[in-house]
From Swiss-Prot:
Compartments (UniProt record): Cell inner membrane
Record's protein name: Cytochrome c biogenesis ATP-binding export protein CcmA
Coiled coil: none
Binding site residues for ATP: G41, A42, N43, G44, A45, G46, K47, T48
SMART domains attached to this UniProt entry: AAA
Gene that this polypeptide is encoded by: ccmA
Length: 193
């Protein structure tokens, strides 16, 4: 990934309503290469909604988003089918993206080698979460949008993800993540909803 000085994402004046209730108004942010922004707020404050908006999955009621960088989105649902093994899951995504990344190396990096051929219905929540994050390594995209990335991860899983995140930031990538507990996360800035 080539390091650039242009923002990987910028947003201004964002507003969103849920029914008649204003979740947030006037939110703005700029994300440069190597930065990590954490979205904070109580349950129901709109963190996931804002992330989905930044990913282009929903539209704001007001405001503008410039997202010149290709991005990865990892939400609450891992997207792994019950019959799909981690190896098959990654192979399908690799084919869809035209990736030549080593699936075996990625499985090893996220401690999924022993579970590589276990159907999704039998994986633990942490194994499913790590499988979802393995997709991040299939194709280099500078911008990662992560919804509660540490959910279901034990201490070892969190350490593995921290290493993946640190490597991404070191190479000029950037991250926006919603989190309740950002301990150990390389926070550049916070947005509180």
């Amino acid at each position: 990934m080539t390091v650039s000085t242009a923002p990987l994402l910028s947003a201004s004046g964002l507003a969103i309503l849920r029914g008649e209730r204003v979740l947030f108004r006037g939110i703005g942010l700029t994300l440069q290469p190597g930065e990590a922004i954490v979205l904070r707020g109580a349950n129901g404050a709109g963190k996931t909604t804002l992330l989905r908006m930044l990913a282009g999955l929903t539209r704001p009621e007001a405001g503008e988003i410039a997202r010149p960088a290709a991005h990865h989105w990892i939400g609450h649902k891992e997207g792994i089918k019950p019959q799909e093994t981690p190896r098959i899951h990654l192979a399908l995504w690799a084919k869809a993206w035209g990736s030549s990344a080593s699936i075996a190396d990625i499985l090893d990096q996220l401690a999924l080698t022993r579970a590589a051929d276990v159907p999704g219905r039998y994986l633990s929540a942490g194994q499913r979460r790590r499988t979802a994050f393995a997709r991040l390594l299939l194709e280099a995209r500078p911008l990662w949008l992560l919804d509660e990335p540490y959910t279901a991860l034990d201490a070892a899983g969190k350490t593995m993800l921290d290493q993946v995140i640190s490597g991404h930031l070191r190479t000029g990538g950037a991250i926006i993540a919603s989190m309740h507990d950002a301990a150990g996360f390389p926070v550049t800035a916070e947005v509180t909803l």
